[in-house]
């Protein structure tokens, strides 16, 4: 509601919706709210999330299920109704799914969150392929920002955030993604934070090519071809 109030105060129009994103009913109601108020849907940004950070040994089944349900299933539940509406009505559009450096690079204490965010990356990649014939563009966002959800992370609690780390500095990157300026970039992930905007990409090496049965020792002998050089490894923001 705070964001809605800010948009209205600035002369725009906006409505809030409090449905549960992790249910099919909630996802359908979010679409209905948009259609009831604006008549069509052009953009969906899936950004709802929670944290239950613990080391894997201390993560309960409830911790796992809750985080995966909100992030991964929530992305599915919100995307399906919008996808179906765009497809059935012949309306091109843009869907942005929020992944994370935790899912793309890994981060201690976030096995549930990292698994969900990696799943969102795979989901985004598949839909970017399937969406081509419908004119539906799908991109991934890996944001870095000081938010209510991340304010209790180690090193952030009781600390004033750097102004450059606020969500306001992620918004321009997302605006680029949903605009026609990014028309040629479906299927890509952008890391967006106070330090800038960059593409995050999954790559493979040329590898060790075989023409006959091989052994584990053969793989080890060709390790320089199999693995990336250490200097090209990428780390999250």
Outline where the language-model segments fall.
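Residue(s) in the substrate-gating loop at a strand-loop-helix junction
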Residues: 100
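The beta1-alpha1 cofactor-binding region of Rossmann-like NAD(H)/NADP(H)-dependent oxidoreductases
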Residues: 18-29, 61
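Substrate-binding pocket helix/loop in short-chain dehydrogenase/reductase
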Residues: 55-56, 63-65
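The catalytic Tyr-X3-Lys active-site helix of short-chain dehydrogenase/reductase
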Residues: 103-106, 111-119
């Amino acid at each position: 509601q705070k964001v809605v109030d800010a948009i209205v105060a600035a002369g725009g129009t906006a409505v809030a919706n409090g449905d549960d994103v992790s249910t099919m009913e909630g996802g359908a109601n979010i679409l209905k709210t948009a259609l009831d108020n604006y008549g069509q849907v052009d953009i969906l940004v899936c950004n709802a999330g929670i944290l239950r950070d613990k080391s894997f040994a201390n993560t309960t089944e409830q911790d796992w299920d809750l985080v995966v349900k909100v992030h991964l299933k929530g992305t599915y539940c919100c995307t399906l109704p919008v996808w179906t509406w765009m497809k059935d009505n012949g309306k091109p559009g843009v869907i942005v799914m929020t992944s994370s450096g935790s899912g793309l690079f890994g981060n201690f204490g976030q096995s549930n969150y990292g698994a969900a965010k990696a799943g969102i990356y795979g989901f985004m990649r598949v839909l970017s392929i399937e969406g081509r014939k419908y004119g539906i563009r799908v991109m991934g966002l890996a944001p870095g920002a000081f938010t209510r959800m991340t304010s209790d992370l180690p090193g952030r609690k009781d600390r004033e955030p750097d102004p450059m780390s606020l969500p306001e500095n992620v918004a321009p990157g997302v605006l680029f993604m949903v605009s026609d300026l990014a028309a040629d970039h479906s299927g890509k992930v952008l890391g967006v934070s106070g330090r800038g905007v960059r593409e995050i990409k999954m790559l493979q090496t040329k590898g060790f090519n075989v023409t006959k049965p091989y052994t584990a020792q053969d793989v080890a002998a060709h390790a320089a071809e199999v693995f990336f050089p250490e200097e090209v490894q990428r780390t999250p923001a």
